[in-house]
Amino acid sequence: MVVVAPTGIAAINAGGVTIHSFFQIPFAPYVPESSFSTNGKASYRFRFGKEKINIIRSMDLLVIDEISMVRADLLDAVDEMLRRYRDPYKPFGGVQLLMIGDLQQLAPVVKDEEWQMLSKYYDTPYFFSSRALKQTEYCTIELKTVYRQNDGDFLELLNRIRENHCDPQVLETLNRRYLPGFQPRKEEGYILSLIHISEPTRKEA
């Protein structure tokens, strides 16, 4: 089994590596049915070392975490790599895929100029528009039990935000939790977003 994810943080959390790192895929958009990147160079034409080839050929399961962030062209690039060193006639070389994620979370990142080119081949930038994936008969399993939260009211609030239903009651509940001037202690493990970190700098400018 090999575990990969689209970003470094997601890969660390999943106990794996990034998709680009494992498959040595360039960051340029991938053109389906071609081994060429946008600049016309054969960026996808290279050889893996014996150790990597052995890993790919012995792989029975490929786990992709945070699948909502994976672009369709990236998934097709993975398909090409697996077909190259396994069964060229089967999607993803015949490797079983387990894709984990929430489509209501982060979307794939695609620049306007990249999408102008990719839109010729894909209906959407999301992974489910992958040509290789459309050749498979995959099944979807929805996980409904929440294990991270035990507070029913808080869970309901999170679900409302997730579904973009921020009514006055939700906003009031969130505002009651706001603590002006709050300074967390380092040992408590709070996570600060870049927006909060950069806000004082913008005010002083």
What are these regions (language model features)?
Residues 1-202:
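Conserved ATP-binding/catalytic motifs of P-loop helicase motor domains
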